[in-house]
């Protein structure tokens, strides 16, 4: 008999939900993680009494009551509402695109005026069959919104010109003809009081966890340690990139403590000009309405991913999705290995979808 029922590779949200639920079923699990901490990309670090989102802003939002109730077992959530602001040439615009945005951009007041301007600008482009992201954005929203709020930010995010990006990245532009800066449409939203790391700690209570462990080295030394493996790392890395590497985007952060109480007055400020090198600045204290004397900001830079870097989100274009389908076929042949999570499923998951995917998968276990 093997030492563990499950070896769970990755102590992020997917792995932690799996470990918590399997422990309730009486299974013995070992959770390992390559990083020196748990909680994956939702890890929060305490700096100056502020919970710093080390791997970028994470706002929990969902319309799934089952998932909301599940998460509330582990933490109380505050009433934070995500209302980012965009800066373009020293002008501030509210996001998402709503009447506050349009009023600032065109000095108008009514939804009818906004609709007429957008429709006029759309027609002026002459585009009927968009062939790339630039044409798609112009076709959907006209030139002003594209030039000021989409173009530079998107090019920084993807590291390519909008004319070189596929049109399907922007399926629609979420225009709201009301004065409402709430970014999400979901019924439930908030930040866990005490930060995200505390949630994962609670999920992993009573389960053996080892950090700073590389799975591939560990497997060589302990090939028979568990009956089954739950792998939440990169699916292409698991198979030694034998079909070629899937593409990801990476993100780099410059975090600093500032000797002031309030730097930008908002948790998230996007910089939409191409000439500004970072995509946004996060001021972490505002997620929890902090009153600390100092503040912590993180400048976020998007970058190409290469082997050895942290993969943040998959590049889900046709080429990469087709390659993932080939890896999926290999995965189906792997006995006693379950792939899941953002990297295992090669999917850009919001946190609620990660939790839902883990709970759904657990429903298949005997």
Language model feature labels by segment:
Residues 7-9, 32, 224-236:
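Short hydrophobic core segments
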Residues 4, 26, 207, 225-227, ...:
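Short, well-ordered alpha-helix to beta-strand connector turns
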Residues 4-31, 362:
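N-terminal Rossmann-like FAD-binding beta1-loop-alpha1 element of flavoenzymes
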Residues 13-14, 36-37, 100, 155, ...:
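Short, solvent-exposed loop/turn segments at secondary-structure junctions
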Residues 20-48:
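Glycine-rich FAD pyrophosphate-binding loop
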Residues 227, 237-365:
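C-terminal segments that line or cap access tunnels to active or ligand-binding sites in enzymes
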Residues 48-123:
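Dinucleotide-binding Rossmann-like beta1-alpha1 core, especially the glycine-rich loop
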């Amino acid at each position: 008999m093997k030492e563990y029922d499950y070896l769970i590779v990755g102590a992020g949200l997917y792995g932690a939900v799996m470990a918590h639920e399997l422990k309730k079923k009486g299974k013995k699990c070992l959770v390992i993680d390559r990083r020196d901490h748990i909680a994956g990309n939702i890890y929060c670090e305490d700096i100056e009494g502020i919970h710093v989102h080390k791997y970028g802003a994470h706002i929990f939002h969902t319309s799934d009551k089952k998932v909301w109730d599940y998460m509330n077992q582990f933490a109380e959530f505050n009433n934070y509402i995500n209302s980012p602001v965009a800066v373009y040439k020293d002008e501030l615009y509210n996001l998402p695109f709503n009447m506050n945005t349009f009023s600032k951009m065109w000095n108008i007041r009514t939804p009818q005026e906004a609709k007429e301007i957008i429709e006029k600008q759309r027609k002026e482009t002459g585009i009927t069959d968009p062939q790339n992201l630039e044409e798609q954005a112009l076709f959907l929203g006209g030139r002003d919104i594209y030039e000021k709020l989409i173009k530079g930010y998107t090019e920084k995010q993807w590291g390519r010109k909008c004319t070189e990006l596929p049109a399907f990245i922007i399926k629609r532009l979420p225009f709201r003809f009301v004065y409402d800066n709430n970014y999400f449409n979901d019924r439930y939203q908030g930040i866990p009081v005490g930060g995200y790391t505390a949630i994962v700690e609670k999920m992993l209570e009573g389960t053996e966890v080892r950090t700073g462990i590389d799975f591939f080295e560990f497997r060589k030394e302990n090939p028979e340690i568990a009956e089954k493996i739950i792998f939440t790392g990169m699916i292409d890395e698991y198979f030694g990139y034998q079909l070629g590497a899937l593409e990801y985007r990476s993100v780099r952060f410059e975090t600093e403590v500032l000797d002031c109480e309030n730097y930008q007055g908002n948790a998230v400020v996007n910089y939409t000009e191409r000439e500004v090198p970072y995509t946004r600045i996060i001021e972490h204290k505002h997620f929890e309405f902090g009153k600390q004397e100092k503040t912590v900001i993180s400048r976020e830079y998007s970058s190409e991913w290469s082997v050895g870097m942290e993969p943040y989100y998959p590049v889900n274009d046709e080429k990469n999705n087709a390659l993932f389908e080939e890896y999926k076929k290999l995965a189906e042949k792997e006995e006693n290995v379950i792939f899941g999570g953002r990297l295992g499923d090669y999917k850009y998951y919001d946190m609620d979808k990660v939790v839902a995917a883990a709970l759904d998968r657990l429903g298949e276990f005997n």
